[in-house]
Curated annotation (Swiss-Prot):
This is Deoxyuridine 5'-triphosphate nucleotidohydrolase. The gene is dut. CDD domains: trimeric_dUTPase. It catalyses: dUTP + H2O = dUMP + diphosphate + H(+). Its cofactor is Mg(2+). The keyword Transmembrane helix does not apply. It is an enzyme of class 3 (hydrolase). InterPro entries: dUTPase, dUTPase-like, dUTPase-like_sf, dUTPase_trimeric.
Length: 145
């Protein structure tokens, strides 16, 4: 499926690094390195604007290597880029690591996955919701061990 893009100066198209990759890497479109202190977050430009086909979204996800080795992740993971958004794709990175992390120009900072979207119709139900074995137990209360 084709996703048409516009690139700002220095921007690069998302790129799949292997034939079986689900996510295409996004690069930091910055001129100077950015120091991300432990606990700090930053909005990183990619220099990419996308025309996402209707009925799809781009999900912005962390790169596993950055998360494992440095504690760097996408704060609102997965971030959603809606099909009607035409602004620059930017990535909210946060440093959960113990040391300062340097984001270098052109560094691969996140990945995007093209995903289908199904919109629900939300309706107020006049009678009680159907009962389940789980009931209202949430946040670690599935009953599974």
């Amino acid at each position: 499926m084709t996703v048409f893009c516009e690139l700002d100066s220095g921007g690069e198209l998302p790129e799949y690094t292997t034939p079986g990759a689900a996510g295409a890497d996004l690069r930091a479109n910055i001129e100077e390195p950015i120091a991300l202190l432990p606990g700090q977050r930053a909005l990183i430009p990619t220099g990419i604007k996308a025309e996402i086909p209707e009925g799809y979204e781009l999900q912005v996800r962390p790169r596993s290597g950055l998360a494992l080795k440095h504690g760097i992740t996408v704060l609102n993971s997965p971030g959603t880029i809606d099909s009607d958004y035409r602004g620059e794709i930017r990535v909210i990175l946060i440093n959960f690591g113990d040391s300062t992390f340097i984001i270098e120009p052109k560094m691969r900072i996140a990945q995007v996955v093209l995903s289908p979207v199904v919109q629900a119709t939300f309706v107020v139900k006049q009678e009680s919701l159907a009962e389940t074995a789980r009931g209202s137990g949430g946040f670690g209360h599935t009953g599974a061990s």
